[in-house]
């Protein structure tokens, strides 16, 4: 039965988290591995088993070529694919694999089907990236009710129980992206005033700095560049990440990687000591990259640092002391420490899910578009229709005209960004409006309307006001996914889910078969004298049949279950035979010794042993249970003519 709960998902670069409203409070959901966060990692093993999350991360050193990490950094990129198991996948598809696991684990935890989700994205994600994220959710089987900016979600988690009016700044440094947002909170209204960020800055870059340092030191000492060896590079990656984490609480750490490579003289080991001071000097340029967006967000909001009442840190990378110190130096405010940086975004997404589901009252979220939107006009200029930091949803229109005489069509090219030259911004899409009656240049009036919905997704329409002809476009994700393509990917994802389920059932069948063989061998060995020769031979034949099927890698679940059931029947026969023998022995003993007081307990003890054996022989089922068209802008006087 489907639940009416809406799952809040923080789909992160390195780790993801998910939560749901339980009563009046959001609650993080523990995944199948018992963890509160799930690594955003996907892998394919040699036997074509797909791994997602912690199992995928755990095997990355042995299988670096078939392990995908930080796919979020490529969301919305056209023509970008990764190869897994001989097949190419888009970032949307890989992200959907992660979301599938999240969906499955949440349903297992809650005991209900989950159909709807709120998924968060970096505030500085453009339209392509937002649409790509929504597509990923739909591929995974979710109805994506809302796309929410990560800093906004975090502010909701922070301010849920706070009725005071205040201005907060959310500094969100995750694994692959950086965002900063300024919000006004009060009376249950969360209003984003300004946002800024860098989609190419995150904890991965701190790791890369340590990797480069380690590889450089090793090359200086041994003349070998470990970055040319995929497996060694992956070991460096894991060691760098671990060192970064350790240096958040320690002054120095030792990085020890034995047998990192080999030469003609034998194996070579890596051992380096990294101090926090050295680490911070290696990454000083990275932390400085967060200063510009932070100052710009304050400027766009019209605030000074003294206007900020609270600073919230979001994202695991904000645990680094240099980050906390930089934020405090920059804003003059000590960041709050009562918000879990790994969980705040998911909790806020769950709160927004509760609002949409009608479970949470008196909360209004007023988010903004992070970048300006407009079209290319004559001379390649970028003409803005919607400025950055405009509250969404919103709609704006502007009238343009043709730049050439007798122009019967115009090409509308939609861009997003802050550069004055259109081509230097992000091209979101383009479409053609035809059927414009021939007329002198500057005569036709073409109204262009931009609409941004609550998810930050853009629809653009152009209408020739003379003829009434109109065309429109909804900006698609990075792969330009149509409904049909999304449906196809959903089917592929579901097919993989069924395949995974079949694999699980087959493994469980094999486990039951192996257990039955082990029980049979134990029974034959321990009760050889109590089993007649015919039954013993029959059981040995059944064991051989089971072992033969287990040796066949192509054996189906049904074939395995058939031979296991046959063996289990024979084992039950053993139980019956031995029970009868025990009964007879008990009766004879009673006849010889009379109704002695010790006979009853002796018989009961034997019956207890038989009961255990009978249970073991029939426990196969129990195991399973556990188991161009240039444009000219028309000025206001022209519009009125």
UniProtKB/Swiss-Prot annotation:
Composition skew (Basic and acidic residues), residue ranges: 493-511
Keyword match Chaperone: yes
Segments of skewed composition (Gly residues): 588-618
InterPro entries: ATPase_NBD, Chaperone_DnaK, Heat_shock_70_CS, HSP70_C_sf, HSP70_peptide-bd_sf, Hsp_70_fam
Region (Disordered): 488-527, 585-641
Biased composition (Acidic residues): 622-641
Key words of the record: ATP-binding, Chaperone, Nucleotide-binding
Single GO MF descriptor: ATP binding
PROSITE patterns given in the database record: HSP70_1 (PS00297), HSP70_2 (PS00329), HSP70_3 (PS01036)
Family assignment from sequence similarity: Belongs to the heat shock protein 70 family.
Record's protein name: Chaperone protein DnaK
Species of origin: Haloquadratum walsbyi (strain DSM 16790 / HBSQ001)
Gene: dnaK
